[in-house]
UniProtKB/Swiss-Prot annotation:
Region entry Disordered, spans: 151-247
Gene: ASF1
Stated name of the protein: Histone chaperone ASF1
Subcellular location: Nucleus
Keywords from the named record: Chaperone, Chromatin regulator, Coiled coil, Nucleus, Transcription, Transcription regulation
InterPro entries in alphabetical order: ASF1-like (IPR006818), ASF1-like_sf (IPR036747), Hist_deposition_Asf1 (IPR017282)
The organism of origin for this protein: Candida albicans (strain SC5314 / ATCC MYA-2876) (Yeast)
Oligomeric and partner information: Interacts with histone H3 and histone H4.
Signal peptide: none
Length: 247
């Protein structure tokens, strides 16, 4: 559970010139006392193609933070135009307002920013070189994108970093259960081997050939009995032909 919850952000000084500072009235709730300060940071995304053009406009430490509802005014300077690609100065970009505790970010709010010229003439016929003094920004304050992250707070040190250790007794019981299961499997395999030795070729025949129906078994028994009776009585060694009821 997050100890600090962001409850509201009011975007001030909007719309404004590109070179004007950013202003935010930030409100958050703290559920428990914090040992460290909160770090708030505003980042301007200078290019959609590379992070190298991102600019950290300002950062501020807020603390000590009392329990309850807290509010403060966060101001940040405008980005440096010379650090932004000329093709992306007059376009749509993003600013990111984030908060961290103990160098761990737990909330991030992103806003789209539309940069355009302040006159219709410049919008229709933009100059070859960007006239930054005539560029205005408009933050889409009504459509923020909020992302939250789980972190370890003061009262949760080590709670999420390492899994709980199992007692040694439980580990020994699990090992004994595994050994018992292995012994039972070995015994089952030995029993299967004994069955094959006792049945001889019959087991092999069942694996290689189709299983006979009860009627076929009866016929085989009759053949064996007839053959044995003929050998005992007449001493005839020729194979006896036994016709089935269909024959």
């Amino acid at each position: 559970m997050s100890i600090v919850s962001l409850t509201g952000i009011e975007v001030l000084n909007n719309p404004a010139k590109f070179t004007d500072p950013y202003e935010f009235q930030i409100t958050f709730e703290c559920l428990e006392p914090l040992k460290e300060d909160l770090e708030w940071k505003l980042t301007y995304v200078g290019s959609s193609d590379s992070l190298d053009h991102d600019q950290e406009l300002d950062s501020i430490l807020v603390g000590p933070v009392p329990v309850g509802i807290n509010s403060f005014l966060f101001k940040a300077d405008a980005p440096s135009p010379e650090l932004i690609p000329a093709s992306e100065l007059v376009s749509v970009t993003v600013i990111i307002l984030s908060c961290s505790y103990n160098d761990k970010e737990f909330v991030r709010v992103g806003y789209y920013v539309n940069n355009e010229y302040d006159t219709e003439e410049l919008r229709e016929n933009p100059p070859a070189k960007v006239a930054i003094d005539h560029v205005v920004r408009n933050i889409l304050a009504e459509k923020p994108r909020v992302t939250r992250f789980n972190i370890v707070w003061d009262n949760e040190e080590g709670a999420d970093e390492y899994p709980p250790e199992q007692p040694e007794d439980e580990e020994e019981e699990e090992e004994e259960e595994e050994e018992g299961e292995e012994e039972e499997e070995d015994e089952d395999e030995e029993d299967d081997d004994d069955d094959e030795d006792l049945n001889g070729d019959a087991v092999v025949d069942l694996e290689k050939e189709e299983i006979s129906t009860p009627r076929d078994n009866d016929e085989d028994i009759e053949i064996d009995i007839a053959s044995e009776s003929e050998v005992e009585e007449g001493g005839v060694e020729e194979e006896a032909k036994v016709n089935t009821p269909k024959d």
